[in-house]
Amino acid sequence: MMAAKPVREIIKYADGTVKARGSRLNGEMHGAWSFFRLDGSLMRSGRFDRGRQVGVWKTFTRDGALVKDTDFGA
């Protein structure tokens, strides 16, 4: 049996602007993900391990300044 491979996914707002970008493995968020505001600015980025947030997630202001790091552990 072949191992499942991550599938890239782009989620968009109704107007077509990218809302989120990342990969899914067996239907679950897996690997690096980035989430964007409706204005296109990066809001948050981090990693998932089979649907669970892991490691350090970064949250940004609209102008790109780092607001906080949130550590979800391994």
Predicted regions and their residues:
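Glycine/tyrosine- and acidic-biased, solvent-exposed loop/turn segments at the edges of beta-strands
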Residues: M1-A74
